[in-house]
């Protein structure tokens, strides 16, 4: 059976760390920023770890070779 291909959209959105955690950018920074405080906008920078169960599903179905 051939290897599963990695989904190219997931390749751009998720990174798997050396310990196996799945990291992703924070949500909520595309539009509607005028109603957020400067502190809220600042705290949305960077990446966050995804919950373990969601991360396991991402690794299994979208990033099988990671």
Swiss-Prot record:
A GO BP entry: translation
Domain of life of the native organism: Bacteria
UniProt lineage: Bacteria, Pseudomonadati, Pseudomonadota, Alphaproteobacteria, Hyphomicrobiales
The entry's keywords: Ribonucleoprotein, Ribosomal protein
GO cellular component annotations of the record: cytosolic large ribosomal subunit
Annotated InterPro entries: Ribosomal_bL35, Ribosomal_bL35-like, Ribosomal_bL35_CS, Ribosomal_bL35_sf
Annotated region described as Disordered, given as residue ranges: 22-41
GO molecular function: structural constituent of ribosome
Pfam families noted in UniProt: Ribosomal_L35p
PANTHER family: 54S RIBOSOMAL PROTEIN BL35M, LARGE RIBOSOMAL SUBUNIT PROTEIN BL35M
Family statement drawn from the similarity comment of this UniProt entry: Belongs to the bacterial ribosomal protein bL35 family.
Name by which UniProt lists this protein: Large ribosomal subunit protein bL35
Compositionally biased tracts (Basic residues): 27-41
Organism: Rhodopseudomonas palustris (strain ATCC BAA-98 / CGA009)
């Amino acid at each position: 059976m051939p290897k599963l291909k990695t989904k190219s959209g997931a390749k751009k959105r998720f990174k798997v760390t050396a310990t196996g955690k799945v990291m992703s950018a924070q949500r909520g920074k595309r539009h509607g920023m005028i109603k957020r405080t400067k502190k809220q906008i600042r705290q949305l920078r960077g990446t966050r770890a995804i919950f373990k169960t969601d991360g396991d599903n991402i690794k299994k179905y979208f990033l099988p070779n990671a």
